[in-house]
Amino acid sequence: MTAILERRESESLWGRFCNWITSTENRLYIGWFGVLMIPTLLTATSVFIIAFIAAPPVDIDGIREPVSGSLLYGNNIISGAIIPTSAAIGLHFYPIWEAASVDEWLYNGGPYELIVLHFLLGVACYMGREWELSFRLGMRPWIAVAYSAPVAAATAVFLIYPIGQGSFSDGMPLGISGTFNFMIVFQAEHNILMHPFHMLGVAGVFGGSLFSAMHGSLVTSSLIRETTENESANEGYRLGQEEETYNIVAAHGYFGRLIFQYASFNNSRSLHFFLAAWPVVGIWFTALGISTMAFNLNGFNFNQSVVDSQGRVINTWADIINRANLGMEVMHERNAHNLPLDLAAIEAPSTNG
């Protein structure tokens, strides 16, 4: 016993710090990824709150027409947002010390870059921390794999898309109405609704919601009663109990008769893998779709694809969507372009003397 105490006392300060960082006995696990996650997420959160409340208007389009996004400059919770970094900055790394003054940094939307880059680093470290804690506890790594879907989606809209478009001003604003504006403009410029990867993402999100509701309702409906009629059924469960809390055979039989036999899982493990994999794979595809459309590999174009025997166009829903896209596009950055992009691309005729 004496030898053990002596060994503990002789342990270096660094060794004790390492043991504390990697200890699974802490109320909240820190881990080596947490050492980077905590300061980056605290920085992103702090700057977001301050900027959402008090940041001055930002010249997002680089045309000396600042756009207001903070509460103190006339917005509310719905309309407020962190305005993306100015198109005048493009993809340049724009920390505070690169600007001539803090006022210039704020005018050019410096807080957006600061928040986004710290946030992406923080959520990536959160994913690594999930893997690290799973490793320490001897668990399989699939929690971190599942979390990679929202990390990929955030990286796509905040980093990959601006890189593909050439400016952080094309990134998604950090606010409710700003998010909707980003979605509308994205549809106008890339026809995302006609992209198969977005369709897979919709199937993943809505399908995941459906399967989650089906699973939860089936389990809740087939609980093994351990309580009286006057008690909540939830009181019949104790954390860590060895007995099954619901009858999977009854749930399997019910669903097999409701749809057909092979629509129901008879293996709880494969069922829960399916519940996790379906939305994750769907969101992976959506993130991949955003990343490809960032470089203008856009959704399908079926405009004027149906004509009659005389060559006259018979409009389809694709043409209706195209007309909506044109309307949304001409309303976007309406003061930044003197001509629609289709006309601006045509060479002007040369004139002599």
UniProtKB/Swiss-Prot annotation:
The further comment given in this record reads: 2 of the reaction center chlorophylls (ChlD1 and ChlD2) are entirely coordinated by water.
Question: Could you tell me the membrane topology recorded for this protein?
Answer: Multi-pass membrane protein
| Keywords carried by this UniProt record | Acetylation, Calcium, Chlorophyll, Chloroplast, Chromophore, Electron transport, Herbicide resistance, Iron, Magnesium, Manganese, Membrane, Metal-binding, Oxidoreductase, Phosphoprotein, Photosynthesis, Photosystem II, Plastid, Thylakoid, Transmembrane, Transmembrane helix, Transport
List the catalytic activities from the record: 2 a plastoquinone + 4 hnu + 2 H2O = 2 a plastoquinol + O2
Pfam families, per database record: Photo_RC (PF00124)
Q: Where in the cell is it found?
A: Plastid, Chloroplast thylakoid membrane
State what this protein does.
Photosystem II (PSII) is a light-driven water:plastoquinone oxidoreductase that uses light energy to abstract electrons from H(2)O, generating O(2) and a proton gradient subsequently used for ATP formation. It consists of a core antenna complex that captures photons, and an electron transfer chain that converts photonic excitation into a charge separation. The D1/D2 (PsbA/PsbD) reaction center heterodimer binds P680, the primary electron donor of PSII as well as several subsequent electron acceptors.
On cofactor binding, the record's note says:
The D1/D2 heterodimer binds P680, chlorophylls that are the primary electron donor of PSII, and subsequent electron acceptors. It shares a non-heme iron and each subunit binds pheophytin, quinone, additional chlorophylls, carotenoids and lipids. D1 provides most of the ligands for the Mn4-Ca-O5 cluster of the oxygen-evolving complex (OEC). There is also a Cl(-1) ion associated with D1 and D2, which is required for oxygen evolution. The PSII complex binds additional chlorophylls, carotenoids and specific lipids.
What GO terms fall under cellular component here?
Answer: chloroplast thylakoid membrane; photosystem II
Binding positions for pheophytin a per the UniProt entry: 126
Q: Give the protein name, as stated in the record.
A: Photosystem II protein D1
Gene source species: Gossypium barbadense (Sea Island cotton)
